[in-house]
Each structure stands twice: as C-alpha cells, then as structure tokens.
Amino acid sequence: MRKPFSQALPQASASGLPVQVAAVCFRVREAAVEFLLVNTTAGKWTFPKGRIDPDLSASESAAREALEEAGAKGRIEKVHFGSYTDTKRAFGHENRVREISIAAFLLEVADMVHPQEGDRNPTWFTPLEAQERLAERRAPKYADGLARIVDAAVDRVIAASLSQNGAARSSRLSLQR
C-alpha cells in the first residue's frame, strides 16, 4: 500500500534535481562516534543511499538502503536532518553523470547482517576519516556538502546523548569527534 504523500519527499528538489535518500549510519563505541560508509560502483565512498520506494516512506526507504547496501539494522529518524548534492552515473551510460539531491536520515545501528549487495565493503570510520573518504574523487562542492552532513550528524548524536544521558557523556563524545 502506498504511503500518504505527506510522508514522502518530492521526486525532484526545488532546484529540479532528482531526490534520493541516504541513511547516515552511526554507532558510538568507547565514547567515539563512528560512521558506516559503503563503496559505490564507481569506487567512491558514500552513505547507503537510493531511490524512494513508492510503497515506503522516505525514512523507511533510507533504512532499506542501509540494510541492502551495508547490512545495517537500527533505529532511523523519521525526518531527514539535512540534504546534500552529489553526482551519479546515468544507468547504462558510463560517461554520463547527473546531479542528484539526497535527503539524509540518521540511523543508529543496532545490528549488522550480511548485506544483500555484497560488493559494497561496509566500513566504519571516525568522523574525520569519513569526511576524508567522502571527499576522495569528488569535486570540492560535493565534498563540502558531505562534510557538513557528517558535522551535523555528530552534532545530532551529541545533542541526543545530552538529552538522554546528561552532560558528562555528551562532553566525552564531543572530545572524540
């Protein structure tokens, strides 16, 4: 059954770019935030992402991408916390690239299973390492947008930790950026 339109993102952004969804997968280990990235078919690192399934909400679609591409299961926020622009090769056209707008949803990973897409090499990185990997083989404007998503995700994780567990844990997390 199709979800109500109000729960879905538009198929095109205000600038006319096609819209996809990404799961910004994270975990906290030893007071440090880590992000789970996967390889694209073009060999770049990225967050698990893909099209919005017409039978799922945008956040459910992002969670599905996390499971399929990275084998990540967990709790996903229902509302995206940011967006960024990236490029994608046109299907079947090796040399044709188009811009896409990606809505980012924060997903706290609770469990890892074998990903359906076994060639994606899901790997955990610190925030700085994630920003460095995400910048590889990308033009600065795309790398900067991804770096802002990582920073915003860290800020959200710290804010959530503060509201749930008090200032002590939050200050330890902020030191481990």
Residue ranges with predicted function:
Residues 16-18, 44, 122:
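A residue-level structural signature of the nucleotidyltransferase/glycosyltransferase Rossmann-like core
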Residues 18-21, 42, 98-102:
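Short connector loops at helix/strand junctions that flank enzyme active sites
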Residues 28-34, 93-96:
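Short, solvent-exposed loop/turn segments that connect beta-strands within catalytic domains
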Residues 36-39:
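Short, acidic/hydrophobic/Gly-rich beta-strand patch recurrent on exposed beta strands
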Residues 46-49:
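A short gly/proline-enriched turn/hairpin at secondary-structure junctions
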Residues 52-142, 175-177:
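Unchanged
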Residues 1-30:
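Acidic, metal-coordinating catalytic segment for phosphate/diphosphate chemistry
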Residues 137-177:
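Charged phosphate-binding loop/patch that engages nucleotide di/tri-phosphates or the phosphate backbone
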